[in-house]
Amino acid sequence: MNNIWWHTKGQGNVHLVLLHGWGLNAGVWRCIDEELSSHFTLHLVDLPGFGRSRGFGALSLADMAEVVLRQAPDKAIWLGWSLGGLVASQIALTHPERVQALVTVASSPCFSARDEWPGIKPDVLAGFQQQLSDDFQRTVERFLALQTMGTETARQDARALKKTVLALPMPEVDVLNGGLEILKTVDLRQPLQNVPMPFLRLYGYLDGLVPRKVVPMLDKLWPHSESYIFAKAAHAPFISHPDEFCHLLVALKQRV
């Protein structure tokens, strides 16, 4: 079985693993990795099939979590952004003893809209899957543009994301498709009611992919978790609000 690309920096006494979102790679954390590595032992990861983690096909969420866990420290704070939030959540569910705290960023336990549940319309996700086979670079770029829409620094933030994608070879179409399939089908709302570790959920008020309406619904469903909304952020608050973002993580570190 292949290993994934994994880079460790910093020498803090708490380990922090960062998992990126769909179509991207660990380069997305460039704006905060220096600051975080002064507080944590930081682990930057390319998810299987993305970035420098080549040689993987489409994986289920459970398989992706197991592949990532193989190279992970014994115990860490796990932070996942968007699709990465589902991977981190899956690890917290299956190996809670390895997770000091769970942090999800602009992530939903169920990305797809369902009855009485706000999310991305299933036909929009299916449309992205269809367009991947026609022109996948343009499809990925459209998805990135959606992530920063509405913020004061939208254009600049979208450029930062695009630069991250273009810095490395594009993932294979079946890997991208597999990631969208996870976003379309996975629902962890009920399982995550029972996670035993500290659980922090971070959101952008202007996020077009994870509607802010889910925040109070999850506050009620998961009373043991904490939520925080970045008032002027969209889907990538760590790019638009890096200082505020790092401050929240350093504060969490004091509590675990």
UniProtKB/Swiss-Prot annotation:
EC number: 3.1.1.85
Any Pfam family hit: Abhydrolase_1
Pathway: Cofactor biosynthesis; biotin biosynthesis
Keywords: Biotin biosynthesis, Cytoplasm, Hydrolase, Serine esterase
Signal sequence extent: none
Subcellular location as annotated: Cytoplasm
GO terms for biological process, alphabetical: biotin biosynthetic process
Limits of the AB hydrolase-1 domain: 15-242
GO molecular function terms attached to this record: pimelyl-[acyl-carrier protein] methyl ester esterase activity
Family indicated by similarity: Belongs to the AB hydrolase superfamily. Carboxylesterase BioH family.
Function of the molecule: The physiological role of BioH is to remove the methyl group introduced by BioC when the pimeloyl moiety is complete. It allows to synthesize pimeloyl-ACP via the fatty acid synthetic pathway through the hydrolysis of the ester bonds of pimeloyl-ACP esters.
Protein name: Pimeloyl-[acyl-carrier protein] methyl ester esterase
